[in-house]
């Protein structure tokens, strides 16, 4: 299960802010790389683990610990998949406008559902029309696994511990 929490902090000191900003920028570059390389036809049928394994095999260095870039990869791939599924809804509408033959409808819907739409010229044209190559506009987001994030209370205030760029070190953020 995926859970999104957005926390606000009014009294974060400059060095912690700069650390978080640097980490978000590095992770934003990874997100952009994912969208650039897999945000089109190249990403159809690929899972985040296949890409992760390929990058590990190639020895790609992102200058961030493994967990943050893997979570960013997973999140970006799920965003691309959601974008592709939204395009499929538009294609379904085009399919229903094009034909009324139940057999042909079923064939086209099945190809679309199984991501085999490249085998049919009409579906390929429609997907190219509605599933244009996406781009990333998010460079200020850090995806943190639930088991890597801790909260604690100090002097009556709630604090959040998140991983930093330094291995086995955390950034403690006061929540207001």
Locations of regions flagged by a protein language model:
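Nucleic-acid substrate recognition interfaces
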Residues: 1-176
């Amino acid at each position: 299960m995926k859970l999104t929490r957005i926390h606000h902090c009014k009294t974060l000191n400059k060095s912690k802010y700069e650390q978080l900003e640097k980490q978000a920028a590095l992770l934003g570059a990874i997100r952009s790389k994912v969208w650039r390389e897999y945000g089109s036809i190249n990403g159809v049928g690929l899972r985040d683990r296949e890409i992760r394994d390929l990058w590990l095999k190639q020895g790609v260095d992102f200058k961030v610990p493994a967990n943050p870039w893997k979570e960013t990869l997973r999140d970006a791939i799920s965003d691309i998949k959601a974008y592709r599924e939204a395009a499929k809804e538009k294609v379904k509408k085009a399919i229903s406008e094009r034909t009324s033959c139940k057999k042909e409808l079923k064939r086209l819907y099945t190809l679309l559902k199984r991501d085999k739409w490249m085998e049919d010229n009409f579906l390929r044209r429609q997907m190219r029309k509605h599933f244009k190559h996406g781009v990333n506009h998010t460079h200020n987001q850090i995806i943190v696994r639930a088991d890597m994030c801790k909260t604690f209370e100090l002097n009556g205030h709630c604090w959040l511990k998140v991983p930093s760029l330094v291995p086995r070190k955390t950034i403690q953020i006061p929540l207001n």
